[in-house]
Amino acid sequence: MDPQKPYKKELKRNSRKRSLNMSQNSERIRIIERDITELKVDAIVNAANNTLLGGGGVDGAIHRAAGPGLLEECRTLNGCPTGEAKITKGYLLPAKYVIHTVGPIWQEGTKGEDEFLASCYRKSLELARKYDVKTIAFPTISTGAYGFPSERAARIAVSQVKEFLKVNELPEIVFLVCYNKEACKNIKKALEENL
């Protein structure tokens, strides 16, 4: 399955960074309810833990689908702090790269969780730009076992992606991948509110 096929469009490449109007910006964001491990995009984002050695949820699914090469490469990275991101090859995944980011554990909003989550999106997008990633897929970071409220996380995700796309040509398309209808509803609402 190639989710980007119907959405491919050529962007004028005047420079690596340029100002994009809001309608172009919004057209570059797609909301889909799919298995992120099956997407044929340049990079998928892994909602990882600090060790980067696999875990539950999307992290475990990505490690299983990518095969043992991913774990071997992750062992060489020496973990990742919360709010940061690191990149590896995709191995057996359809995606060329996996960008691993460590979201915050929700603690009632008292430990800077919003900024850590925002940083996850920014740092992942910065790595994507650095590696010339044209299409990237994000899961809903920190909303599973880490307990971040889904609506709040959706608003942060949408605002960070839109802010980045305003001034960057790459990635061309950002997929926000929902694991259920509730997550999709929250992301759609956040996107509508952030027009």
Curated annotation (Swiss-Prot):
It comes from the Archaea. PROSITE patterns: MACRO. Residues 1-13 have a biased composition (Basic and acidic residues). InterPro entries: Macro_dom, Macro_dom-like. Residues 1-23 are annotated as: Disordered. GO terms for molecular function: deacetylase activity. Residues 16-195 form the Macro domain. CDD domains: Macro_OAADPr_deacetylase. Belongs to the MacroD-type family. This is Macro domain-containing protein MA_1614. It comes from Methanosarcina acetivorans (strain ATCC 35395 / DSM 2834 / JCM 12185 / C2A).
